């Protein structure tokens, strides 16, 4: 299951932006893998109070989203989805800039994590 964890300044989460972010991140994966894949996407939005996030050794005044997408490693190497990691980084960045504004684009960090077979589980069973 594709799973996003997004850390963003708490103040950017105002009760209206959260559904937009969840939808946009889901759509980013669906744009790469297809609409059916989108229904599997999980999203966690994690608000970080402004005084608890720093860049360059000082507290940050910017939203600076840090996004991690994790799913099984094999999904990044499917022949029918060439250049999947690059496409996911691009689609995720575009999605976030679309919701948060273009001025945030240069600060968006996207990390793609591949989980090896046998390293995840569902309901107590290795999947």
Where is each model-derived feature located?
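A domain-level signal for the structural core that forms small-molecule/cofactor-binding pockets
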Residues: 1-127
């Amino acid at each position: 299951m594709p799973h996003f964890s997004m850390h963003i300044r708490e103040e950017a989460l105002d009760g209206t932006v959260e559904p937009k972010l969840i939808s946009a991140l889901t759509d980013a994966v669906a744009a790469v893998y297809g609409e059916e894949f989108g229904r599997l996407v999980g999203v966690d939005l994690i608000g970080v109070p402004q005084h608890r996030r720093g860049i360059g050794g000082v507290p940050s005044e910017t939203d600076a989203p840090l996004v991690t997408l994790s799913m099984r490693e094999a999904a990044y190497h499917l022949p029918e989805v060439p250049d999947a990691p690059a496409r996911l980084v691009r689609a995720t960045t575009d999605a976030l800039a679309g919701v948060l504004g273009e001025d945030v684009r240069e600060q968006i960090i996207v990390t793609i994590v591949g989980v090896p077979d046998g390293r995840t589980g569902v309901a107590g069973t290795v999947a």
